[in-house]
């Protein structure tokens, strides 16, 4: 895909026949592995993020600042996964969609990468404020909602500006086959440094600091809500690290050790870790919606409204879920300070 061009000549032509054969085997493997991975992420991400959008807009109706951020998160991931079929086709065959489409998809990919990561950071900061400064957050809900909408807009604008180099320098190149990418080493270095800072290290540092304080605060709270919140926090951190750290470490190694470009095993590692990183588009709906009782309640409402399951078969389960949700949401202040709504 746009992150790494596996068909570029990194010195393989100067190696022996054995190295050439290994590289050809790798290219054949990438033609199968990457398109399959892209299509799996596309299908799962399309269904999951569409559900989150529909339920958030038409059922939950943006009642909190977290909801404002959560609408932008699946929207960014939804646009991202819609580009994957194009990359899957290009991985199997070659780029046949033209230069304008190439620039557009490179821009969409990059914009949504930054947008998703910055939104995750904003959600983390919001949870920090709600948990650590609960009373102040509750008394300033109107201001926080306005701040959230302005911040969401700024995130999209910043992401667009940061993505301009890839949009401008993105092009179609004719190597062994037509590929879409950007082919300027200076631009690639700048883009990589910016991406590593905004897309990984800054969110990671923010999440570590904020969640450390959140955990310390919740450990003094006690009760069921404390344990539930800690589980969600650890899940968020674990999935973020497991999906993003391997690929970002490989990109860092790639930018500082050019000798690895001639190693087929390095290309395998880059490809696999890249695919794992894209799984975030599927996992985000699970992390930020499916663990919520409110979401499950609204999901059963959606199922009932569209009639995709027999009414008698789900009515009792939906009613039970609704009653449980009412029980847990009896105290607005408890819910607002618990991370539980995530």
From Swiss-Prot:
One of its GO terms (molecular function) is C-X-C chemokine receptor activity. One of its GO terms (biological process) is inflammatory response. It is a multi-pass membrane protein. Keywords: Cell membrane, Disulfide bond, G-protein coupled receptor, Glycoprotein, Membrane, Receptor, Transducer, Transmembrane, Transmembrane helix. The keyword Transmembrane applies. Receptor for the C-X-C chemokine CXCL16. Used as a coreceptor by SIVs and by strains of HIV-2 and m-tropic HIV-1. The keyword Transmembrane applies. It is found in: Cell membrane. This is C-X-C chemokine receptor type 6. InterPro entries: CCR1-9-like (IPR050119), Chemokine_CXCR6 (IPR002235), Chemokine_rcpt (IPR000355), GPCR_Rhodpsn (IPR000276), GPCR_Rhodpsn_7TM (IPR017452). Belongs to the G-protein coupled receptor 1 family. The lineage of its organism: Eukaryota, Metazoa, Chordata, Craniata, Vertebrata. Disulfide bonds join 102-180. GO terms for cellular component: external side of plasma membrane. The gene is CXCR6. The chain crosses the membrane at residues 33-59, 69-89, 104-125, 144-164, 188-215, 232-259, 276-293. Residues 1-32, 90-103, 165-187, 260-275 are extracellular. Residues 60-68, 126-143, 216-231, 294-342 are cytoplasmic. Glycans are attached at residue 16.
């Amino acid at each position: 895909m746009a992150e790494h061009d596996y068909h570029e000549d990194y010195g393989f032509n100067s190696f022996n026949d054995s190295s050439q054969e290994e590289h050809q085997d790798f290219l054949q493997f990438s033609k199968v592995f990457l398109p399959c991975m892209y299509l799996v992420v596309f299908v799962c991400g399309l269904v999951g993020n569409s559900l989150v959008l529909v339920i958030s807009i038409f059922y939950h109706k943006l009642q909190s600042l977290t909801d404002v951020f959560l609408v932008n998160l699946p929207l960014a991931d939804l646009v991202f996964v819609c580009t994957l079929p194009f990359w899957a086709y290009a991985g199997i065959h070659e780029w046949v969609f033209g230069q304008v489409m190439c620039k557009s998809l490179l821009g969409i990919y990059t914009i949504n990468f930054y947008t998703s990561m910055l939104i995750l950071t904003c959600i983390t900061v919001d949870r920090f404020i709600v948990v650590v400064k609960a009373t102040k957050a509750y008394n300033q809900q109107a201001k926080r909602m306005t701040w959230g909408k302005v911040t969401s807009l700024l995130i999209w604008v910043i992401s667009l500006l940061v993505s301009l180099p890839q949009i401008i320098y993105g092009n179609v190149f004719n190597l062994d086959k037509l590929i879409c990418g950007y082919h300027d080493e200076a631009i690639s270095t700048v883009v990589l440094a910016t991406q590593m800072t905004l897309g990984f290290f800054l969110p990671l540092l923010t999440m570590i600091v904020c969640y450390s304080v959140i955990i310390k605060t919740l450990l003094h709270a006690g009760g069921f809500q404390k344990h539930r919140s800690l589980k969600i926090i650890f899940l968020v951190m674990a999935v973020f690290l497991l999906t993003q750290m391997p690929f970002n470490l490989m990109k860092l190694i790639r930018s500082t050790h050019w000798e690895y470009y001639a190693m087929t095993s390095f290309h395998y590692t880059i490809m696999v870790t890249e695919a794992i990183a894209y799984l975030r588009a599927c996992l985000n709906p699970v992390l930020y919606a499916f663990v919520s009782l409110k979401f499950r309640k609204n999901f059963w409402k959606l199922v009932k409204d569209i009639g995709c399951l027999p009414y008698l078969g789900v009515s009792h389960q939906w009613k039970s879920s609704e009653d449980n949700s009412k029980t847990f949401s009896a105290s607005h202040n408890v819910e607002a300070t618990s991370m539980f709504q995530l």
